[in-house]
Amino acid sequence: MESAPRLDNKSRMSREVHVRFCEGLGVRFPRATRLVILCRSPELAVRALEIVGNWVADNGLTLHPTKTQVVDSRTNSFSFLGYEFHGTKHWPRKKSLQQLKGSLKRKTRRTSGDSLEWIIADVNRTLRGWFCYFQHSTRSSVYRGLDSWLRMRLRSLLRRRAGGRGVARDQTASFTWPNAFFAERGLFSLTTAHAKACQSSRR
């Protein structure tokens, strides 16, 4: 069970609430602190929320009214710090993917006058930063989907420069500019990076 309260002020959490990520006698929380408390049963989760609620009230703080909830992650998912959690699985939440795509769209407009090399270098900076945080997804399909979508964007840009029109989703565009074409030009692959990260974690 997850009880996910959010604290909305600077505070100090004592061992009265058993938050085990700190071994000191207290924990300093910055403004709008978010935390997840894992419990073995619904009853313990409700009790944990009650303890936290009493503690924050005693210290002049408040829990966020809509983001504080008790969730059984075995049957329902919940969002936390950009990820979606369900049981033992976790992946970038929909909003996180939308934000990344929005940033990449602005960098890969078909009307861009920048060279492909410059665009790829610019895109790579965004991809590496995003992957640094979101490399822990248990769904590898997330990375494959983003890689495919980005190559489609770049093919559409190249097709326009070659005098063509429309979004390059057809086989002709994939044949003209295959995946290897972009790899040879240094396009960062989320799929490849995730595979390497998984290999490293198994060592």
Please annotate each region the language model reported:
Residues 1-203:
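Non-catalytic terminal/accessory segments
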